[in-house]
């Protein structure tokens, strides 16, 4: 894996998934050079989708993409059985890869993680992207566990690393050849400078062209040019997490007239003071017309 993979929002309209809006967003992203799209992850509000909605979104995204870029379907769960079933479904409908978050809330030990991911890996043939985000799961995949999984299962090929500890990223890259993708927009360049391959991005939903340019410069070793774009987008990157993701990105998309719609409870609308900060940042970047 290499490049920019937006973690796409799930647009809603009148309480249901807005599939036409989803199609428009996907076309916009592909036209602006992304390497793939990642539906039903954190940004896609997977915790508040019903199982049928979750599967339908994956199916529709595969259909809308129609082979133009990769589809990396979010299929993780804190239930190994559910993760396995979602992953098998994603493979059956044509997803290119699956994204598996570490089990949250039940906080398994490292041995439990090995068995959890191993069960899913043995049940499918498509490549698996591990997803480490300790700030949400209260659980870190240790580098030795990542190495074990990469060595043991041929279809575990990449990790979305959202642990902001660059020491951990360095250790992962030092001990195994797994593809490391940043799970934090603002750490994309630092991680790529260590040998990372790109990013699963939030900000790319609204600024895909610029973010793709930044990553392509980094891939070519042109870090001076990449840094210019990084610092240009940095204030907006930080605002994407001024409240819980995906509240800021969906708010920004609504401001820009992009299909996004409401959030599902328990997520709710952004505080007015933060909306003003977001609006100012979008104006500064010339994104608001």
From Swiss-Prot:
Quote one Gene Ontology molecular function term. 4-hydroxy-tetrahydrodipicolinate synthase activity
Highest taxon above the source species: Archaea
Record's GO cellular component, any one? cytoplasm
Q: Which Gene3D superfamilies match?
A: Aldolase class I (3.20.20.70)
Task: List the active-site residues.
Answer: 131 (proton donor/acceptor), 160 (schiff-base intermediate with substrate)
Positions of pyruvate binding: 43, 200
Known Pfam families for this protein? DHDPS
Give the enzyme's main class according to its UniProt record, as a single word: lyase
Quote the subcellular location field of this record. Answer: Cytoplasm
Listed EC numbers: 4.3.3.7
Question: Where is the site labelled Part of a proton relay during catalysis?
Answer: 42, 105
Database matches in InterPro entries: Aldolase_TIM, DapA, DapA-like, Schiff_base-form_aldolases_AS, Schiff_base-form_aldolases_CS
Q: In which pathway does it act?
A: Amino-acid biosynthesis; L-lysine biosynthesis via DAP pathway; (S)-tetrahydrodipicolinate from L-aspartate: step 3/4
Tagged with keyword Transcription? no
Which keywords accompany this UniProt record? Answer: Amino-acid biosynthesis, Cytoplasm, Diaminopimelate biosynthesis, Lyase, Lysine biosynthesis, Schiff base
Query: Which terms under GO biological process does the entry name?
Result: diaminopimelate biosynthetic process; lysine biosynthetic process via diaminopimelate
| Reactions catalysed, as given in the entry | L-aspartate 4-semialdehyde + pyruvate = (2S,4S)-4-hydroxy-2,3,4,5-tetrahydrodipicolinate + H2O + H(+)
The positions making up the signal sequence are none
The entry's family comment says: Belongs to the DapA family.
What HAMAP family does the annotation carry?
DapA
Q: What functional role does this protein have?
A: Catalyzes the condensation of (S)-aspartate-beta-semialdehyde [(S)-ASA] and pyruvate to 4-hydroxy-tetrahydrodipicolinate (HTPA).
Q: How the protein assembles, per its UniProt entry?
A: Homotetramer; dimer of dimers.
Per its record, how is this protein called by name?
4-hydroxy-tetrahydrodipicolinate synthase
